[in-house]
UniProtKB/Swiss-Prot annotation:
Main subcellular location: cytoplasm
Keywords (A to Z) from UniProt: Cytoplasm, Peroxisome, Protein transport, Repeat, Transport, WD repeat
A Pfam match: WD40
Gene Ontology BP annotations: endochondral ossification; ether lipid biosynthetic process; fatty acid beta-oxidation; neuron migration; protein import into peroxisome matrix; protein targeting to peroxisome
Protein name per Swiss-Prot or TrEMBL: Peroxisomal targeting signal 2 receptor
Mapped WD repeat ranges: 60-91, 104-136, 148-179, 191-222, 235-266, 279-310
InterPro entries with a match to the protein in the record: G-protein_beta_WD-40_rep, PEX7, WD40/YVTN_repeat-like_dom_sf, WD40_repeat_CS, WD40_repeat_dom_sf, WD40_rpt
GO MF: enzyme binding; peroxisome matrix targeting signal-2 binding; protein homodimerization activity
């Protein structure tokens, strides 16, 4: 693996990282004081250069920030979510506070995602209040609220293929597929026998979703037949905090865990574990694969560091 570019952020514990879909080398990180248990949060916008990582903008919020998503129609705009139940809309072109705050959830908001299809510009949020909300960022209140989960919601992700369709993962051990047009659940999958902390859609197959759970396993689900997973990936030794499909390889994905590692997988291979990266000393919570560079990965951890690097398995063909 090439040497990681590292930025240490004293007193801030990383929860989420996401590359800009527009600007190569720009990365956003959502972080919290005191491991997110108390204190404030910070949105960090970073740029890469020859000397490493530099902070372009830093925005503070009065509660921990748990997730971040870039706008799909404005390179300067991001949305974060926080422990006080609110979402924040930020403009990196301005060094001021949020342009807008959306406050409807009654508990921590752990997940936020901007729609991937060009048909609409919507944001989905998932909360510990057991609800999912869909927002038009230009409107101050949510468009609709989705109920059905029986525990906290950890992950909400739009389909990159089907407009208005999103997945959610919950402490109730289910993966659920929803449609904004019906405001009801389409599919309920009892995907694990433990809490599910993350899910993601395959970029190359509209029917394939992956889940990562407290049972240390990753499972792939074909939405046309959900009786059993189409793959299971084992190797992590503690809960899987986040999972991301590759934008460049149909069967490659990455996962990060409370075992301090990031692992890379190819579920189509007999020996699917491609590489294990061990460069953090605390829970690794944030993870993203660059949309601009096929080899570049970013992660962040409770060890107060943000890293960008090129794992060997993505730089070697096959």
């Amino acid at each position: 693996m090439s040497a990681a570019r590292t930025l240490r952020v004293p007193g801030r514990h990383g929860y989420a990282a996401e590359f800009s879909p527009y600007l190569p080398g720009r990365l956003a990180c959502a972080a919290a004081q005191h491991y997110g248990i108390a204190g404030c949060g910070t949105l960090l916008v970073l740029d890469q250069n020859e000397s490493g990582l530099q902070i372009f903008r830093s925005f503070d919020w009065n509660d921990g920030l748990f997730d971040v998503t870039w706008s799909e129609n404005n390179e300067h705009v991001l949305v974060t979510c926080s422990g006080d139940g609110s979402l924040q809309l930020w403009d990196t072109a301005k060094a001021t506070g949020p342009l807008q705050v959306y406050k409807e959830h009654t508990q921590e908001v752990y997940s936020v995602d901007w729609s991937q299809t060009r048909g609409e510009q919507l944001v989905v949020s998932g909360s510990w209040d057991q609800t999912v909300k869909v927002w038009d960022p230009t409107v101050g209140n949510s468009l609709c609220t989705f109920r059905g989960h029986e525990s906290v919601i950890y992950s909400t992700i739009w389909s990159p293929h089907i407009p208005g369709c999103f997945a959610s993962a919950s402490g109730d051990q289910t993966l659920r597929i929803w449609d904004v047009k019906t405001t009801g659940v389409r599919i309920v999958i009892p995907a694990h026998q433990t809490e599910i902390l993350s899910c993601d859609w395959c970029k190359y197959n509209e029917n394939l979703v992956v889940t990562g759970a407290v049972d240390c396993s990753l499972r792939g689900w074909d939405l046309r037949n959900v009786r059993q997973p189409v793959f299971e990936l084992l190797g992590h030794t503690y809960a899987i905090r986040r999972v991301k499909f590759s934008p460049f390889h149909a069967s490659v994905l990455a996962s990060c865990s409370y075992d301090f590692t990031v692992r890379f997988w190819n579920f189509s291979k007999p020996d699917p574990l491609l590489e294990t990266v061990e460069h953090h000393t605390e829970f690794t919570c944030g993870l993203d694969l660059s949309l601009q560079s096929p080899t570049q990965v970013a992660d962040c951890s409770w060890d107060e560091t943000i890293k960008i690097y090129d794992p060997v398995c993505l730089t070697v063909p096959g």
